[in-house]
């Protein structure tokens, strides 16, 4: 998997050539290329650029996919709930439904300033990696991992390797983007998360949030 963060790349693969560009991870949709082990890809930087590259073992094959704004599933989650305290923009590129032969699910989430995400707190069996970007270099937030809390800054990363809740929040004034990637287990793919039971009352559309009575 190649995912462009910013800049311009030329990708050469399977007798094809694609030029992908991205000004930043906040204003532009994700662009990148997912390919299997049988495909060779040449990456040429057309200017100063930054991209992420991920790989994992997989015996299955699937068609090479070039991602852009036309084939990324974008959903605003948390809208209209909890006084908009967990509103975020989720950009799913691949999950088990989209490509069951891929053994990774991945995408991006953009936290609006001062908002929470991965909320209500949830957990899952499969390992997950987060890579964070902020719209300003001094931006910061917090990532919860079970009972531990970690400060996150621009280009921080968190590895979720245990079945623990992992909500996160960004400070007021600072937008936060994080790339997330989940590795399926061979006989237990990630198809969704398990909510932390004690917080499920928040899913009631009629729940009262203080100072409501």
Regions found by a protein language model. Give the residues of each.
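A short, polar/proline- and glycine-enriched secondary-structure boundary/capping micro-motif
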Residues: 21-22, 54, 62-65, 130-131, ...
